[in-house]
Amino acid sequence: MKKLALILSCAATLAAPLAFAQTKWDLPTGYATNTFQTENVQQFADDVAKATGGKLKITVHAGASLYKMPEIKRAVQSGQTQAGEFILSAYANENPLFGVDSIPFLATSYSAAQKLYTASKPATEKLLADQGLKLLFSVPWPGQSLYSGKPMKTMDDFKGTKMRAYNPATTRIAQLVKAQPVTIQLAELGQALATGA
């Protein structure tokens, strides 16, 4: 299953021309500094600085240091931050198209993820534009895994356990295996795993 992480920004902000002086943007992400997701976001910020000759400087705020992941979309929509990175499938309850890339086994390779992205991009961009957001780029995620402190040999082993759910699809998977879906922000996941919370 491939997920597409999305960078979004206020359309009005992007439409405004950059001033001759340096313009500074904040870009919050809920992911830690040395993760795949944040490294991609930092590369984007570096590329923008280079492409604009330093006229637009984007500061990446990793590890939910500026906003927690569930707050980022609203912070961008309300203009509290100029851009933000979040997983769009977390908003599949707003529109099923936002979760198309989290349907289990629909896109099981990078090439399949690219085809799915290409097919869904125009409709996704329109939905986001209707919400005052602009898609800047998407990144295919590597495969997902489940981690447990004890071996999970049968479906019965999941009964009553807590399972991190970050979108409607992972919530449904937890329900199907009779686990308890819980919301744990990525920045807090290490501690939750260590304490068994």
Where are these regions (language model features)?
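Positively charged n-region of N-terminal signal peptides that target proteins for export
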Residues: 1-4
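Extracytoplasmic "Venus flytrap"
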Residues: 26-43, 63-68
